[in-house]
Amino acid sequence: MSSQSPKRMYGTGNNFVIIDSRSINNLNWNYREIANQNGCDQIIVITNSSAADCFMHIYNADGGEVEMCGNAARCVGYLIMSEKSTEYATIELVNKRILECFKVGGRSIKVNMGKPLFKWHEIPLSAKCDPLHLPIELEMLKDPVAVNIGNPHMVFFVDNISEIPLQSLGPKLEKHTLFPKKVNVNIAQVEKSGEISLRVWERGTGITASCGSAACAALIASVLRGYLITRQTSVNLPGGKLLIEWPDNIFMTGDIGFL
């Protein structure tokens, strides 16, 4: 992987521009302009790390840096593993988490996303309340679950995700006063098969075809609410399918590719 040679990649419907800046550790890029020119969900900048194989900076289309992106981690993990000719790589994030990436076959990459956080101040919320039943209601959406997967999420459960006007409700919910750092908004439907169908309004980006941490949040919320007994299922997003497992840490597996 050559330094500063941008690559366009995707992870289950999420599109990224990935810049390797390890040779000079340069973060001075116009992220909004890059996003507008390339039509990507996020810009990923790889720099050096003393604690892992690399440090991954994640910038949304609005130019703001965020803490976590599981789908981007799978793409970066693949690049690092290809560079090292190994099947394992580690990635440091701005929130100090170290993600472990594993090659499980072809371009299918598994990521250990770490332990989810559930306490109200860990998510974080601006006021003490029960994260399993947030006092939030907007039109047909109510009673969401909040969880932190390295970034804040709230999950609403509905009978039919296609009926939810996410384009109009997403911006309002993202900026809800209960979330001082804003929040990723997830609309989940637990299917009879035990799989989860999911739509996502991503903080700082908007409606997105996929979001790995959102898929993790959806499984966790489904288990905590008692909608699922198993801690492993497939989450179906507009951009494709992710396998999510929650034995203790949360794991996500899916395909990556180049654009």
From Swiss-Prot:
Catalytic residues (UniProt): 69, 211
Catalytic reaction equation(s): (2S,6S)-2,6-diaminopimelate = meso-2,6-diaminopimelate
Pathway stated in the Swiss-Prot or TrEMBL entry: Amino-acid biosynthesis; L-lysine biosynthesis via DAP pathway; DL-2,6-diaminopimelate from LL-2,6-diaminopimelate: step 1/1
Residue ranges the record marks as coiled coil: none
Domain of life where this protein originates: Bacteria
Chief subcellular location: cytoplasm
InterPro entries reported in the protein's UniProt record: DAP_epimerase_AS (IPR018510), DAP_epimerase_DapF (IPR001653)
Localization: Cytoplasm
SS bonds (residue pairs): none
PROSITE patterns listed in its UniProt record: DAP_EPIMERASE
Ligand binding (substrate): 14, 42, 60, 70-71, 151, 184, 202-203, 212-213
GO annotation terms (biological process): lysine biosynthetic process via diaminopimelate
E.C. designation(s): 5.1.1.7
Keywords: Amino-acid biosynthesis, Cytoplasm, Isomerase, Lysine biosynthesis
Annotated site location: Could be important to modulate the pK values of the two catalytic cysteine residues: 153, 202
GO cellular component, one term: cytosol
GO MF annotation terms: diaminopimelate epimerase activity
Gene3D superfamilies, per database record: Diaminopimelate Epimerase, Chain A, domain 1
Family per record: Belongs to the diaminopimelate epimerase family.
NCBIfam families: DapF
Subunit structure: Homodimer.
Stated role: Catalyzes the stereoinversion of LL-2,6-diaminopimelate (L,L-DAP) to meso-diaminopimelate (meso-DAP), a precursor of L-lysine and an essential component of the bacterial peptidoglycan.
Protein name: Diaminopimelate epimerase
Species for this entry: Wolbachia sp. subsp. Brugia malayi (strain TRS)
